[in-house]
Swiss-Prot record:
It comes from Salmonella newport (strain SL254). Pathway: Sulfur metabolism; hydrogen sulfide biosynthesis; sulfite from sulfate: step 1/3. One of its GO terms (molecular function) is GTPase activity. The lineage of its organism: Bacteria, Pseudomonadati, Pseudomonadota, Gammaproteobacteria, Enterobacterales. Residues 92-96 are annotated as: G2. The keyword Ubl conjugation does not apply. Residues 34-41 are annotated as: G1. It is an enzyme of class 2 (transferase). This is Sulfate adenylyltransferase subunit 1. SUPFAM superfamilies: EF-Tu/eEF-1alpha/eIF2-gamma C-terminal domain, P-loop containing nucleoside triphosphate hydrolases, Translation proteins. With CysD forms the ATP sulfurylase (ATPS) that catalyzes the adenylation of sulfate producing adenosine 5'-phosphosulfate (APS) and diphosphate, the first enzymatic step in sulfur assimilation pathway. APS synthesis involves the formation of a high-energy phosphoric-sulfuric acid anhydride bond driven by GTP hydrolysis by CysN coupled to ATP hydrolysis by CysD. GTP binds at residues 34-41, 113-117, 168-171.
Length: 479
């Protein structure tokens, strides 16, 4: 067992008390990103090493791996703690998104180590989609690079408001303050073009030597700010979803027997209470909450992020992909939207193409109507293009086959974020964030017979895995 972990358990008075203390710690999800060879994996390895999160057998294995695959001579290659793929170790790069967990006395952390190579930018976007904070690594010898700008823009596009600019490899520039100051000024000049109200902090460090990572550096006494670990432990993360109206996308209809019907999913935003009136979209039917069922038993109230099963007082038609919200909330389903897109496929995105799109639990089809512009990540300017290439970022106009209950992504990432799926290969080819909703161009009303509506309801109720379209929802949306 890790000696520091054993000591923590002893201090808490046993395993159960220690586990209870862990549950009450706040959780910070963050990612490391930046250009190639800026030291992202080494930084994570250093954090794990200096917070004593490495077990003895892992340390022994690291010594052996450093001799075979290491790039640091006789020193431990801490990057090997994170780079687990054989191709990563052979090339000395990160390809996949690697997740690691560690905790200190103040906080729990989940780290996403993302690749720096441009061809793996799509992997970086995947890692950023669930994070609250981004650590942007900059090589002190190279300064701000294109990939630094790209990752900064993607992070803010995906709703990350806290950026820690870690200027790494200060040991290779003799820990000069003027180098740090110059890079800081260059990045702040670039950051003026980034969207949103951002919290940007700067830390000069050396991941290889451990300077300013978990302990203050004796080599940079000119830096009076906190270490990287102190920033991570103290940054105040205000989740926007806690303040947003209630949104509950239905992931699964739970019917284990004839006496129970519940609607399972994760509460995307807001809160819900027993007895609260709710509305189902796209049908618009209302009911009230009878029970809130969780793994630990029934609750009177649930908050954003909790996995729950809602039991309603009325037996109404609800299927996977439907959205539950407060009855007094107004959210008109839309068929047209402007979407910020990060394209992840070799084949470019072009107007006229159709894709399956998935939003929370809802899956439907969409057509690309137009590409307004592509972002030039060097200067964040907009330019006209006929198609969006691999790793391209742009604003796209889309039309959905059926009305969807959508939010603006910056307000609610769950109900405002979607993925593009190739209809032939079933491969995820892009990520989208709703920028604007457009209710113009509604489909003319469609009249369905009573038999068609009843058959559709039966199919959606008893065969939800077929993902049958809600004809009643279409009718309301078209009207």
């Amino acid at each position: 067992m890790n000696t520091i972990l054993a000591q923590q358990i002893a201090n808490e008075g046993g395993v159960e008390a220690w586990m209870m203390a862990q549950q009450h710690k706040s959780l910070l999800r963050f990612l490391t990103c930046g250009s190639v060879d800026d030291g992202k994996s080494t930084l994570i390895g250093r954090l794990l090493h200096d917070t004593l999160q490495i077990y003895e057998d892992q340390l022994s294995s690291l010594h052996n791996d450093s001799k075979r695959h290491g790039t640091q001579g006789e020193k431990l290659d801490l990057a090997l703690l994170v780079d687990g793929l054989q191709a990563e170790r052979e090339q000395g790069i990160t390809i996949d998104v690697a997740y690691r967990y560690f905790s200190t006395e103040k906080r729990k952390f989940i780290i996403a180590d993302t690749p720096g190579h441009e061809q793996y930018t799509r992997n970086m976007a995947t890692g950023a989609s669930t994070c609250d904070l981004a650590i942007l690594l900059i090589d002190a010898r190279k300064g701000v690079l294109d990939q630094t700008r790209r990752h900064s823009f993607i992070s803010t596009l995906l709703g990350i408001k806290h950026l820690v600019v870690a200027i790494n490899k200060m040991d290779l520039v003799d820990y000069r303050e003027e180098t740090f100051a110059r890079i800081r000024e260059d990045y702040l000049t670039f950051a003026e073009q980034l969207p949103g109200d951002l919290d940007i902090r700067f830390v000069p460090l050396s991941a290889l030597e451990g300077d300013n990572v978990a302990a203050q550096s004796a080599n940079m006494r000119w830096h009076s700010g906190p270490t990287l670990l102190e920033v991570l432990e103290t940054v105040d993360i205000q989740r926007a979803v806690d303040r947003q109206p209630m949104r509950f996308p239905v992931q699964y209809v739970n019917r284990p027997n004839l006496d129970f019907r519940g609607y399972a999913g994760t509460l995307a935003s807001g809160s819900v209470k027993v007895g609260e009136r709710i509305k189902v979209l796209p049908s618009g039917v209302e009911s009230s909450v009878a029970r809130i069922v969780t793994f630990d038993g029934d609750k009177e109230e649930a908050c954003a992020g909790e996995a729950i099963t809602l039991v309603l007082n009325d037996d109404i038609d609800i299927s996977r992909g439907d959205l539950l919200l407060a009855a007094n909330e107004t959210l008109a389903p839309a068929r047209h939207a402007a979407i910020d897109v990060v394209w992840m496929a070799e084949q470019p995105l072009a107007p006229g193409q159709s894709y399956d799109v998935k939003l929370a639990g809802k899956k439907t089809r969409a057509r690309i109507e137009a590409i307004r512009y592509q972002i030039d990540i060097n200067n964040l300017t907009q330019r006209d293009v006929e198609s969006l290439p691999l790793n391209g970022i742009g604003l796209v106009e889309m039309t959905f086959d059926e009305p969807l209950a959508l939010d603006i992504y910056q307000q609610n990432p769950v109900t405002g974020g979607l993925i593009f799926i190739d209809r032939l290969s079933n491969v995820t080819v892009g990520a989208g964030m709703v920028r604007e909703l457009d209710e113009r161009g509604a489909t003319p009303p469609v009249e369905y017979s009573a038999f068609e509506l009843e058959l559709n309801a039966l199919v959606r109720r008893h065969f939800p895995h077929w993902d049958a379209r809600d004809l009643l929802g279409d009718k309301h949306g078209a009207a």
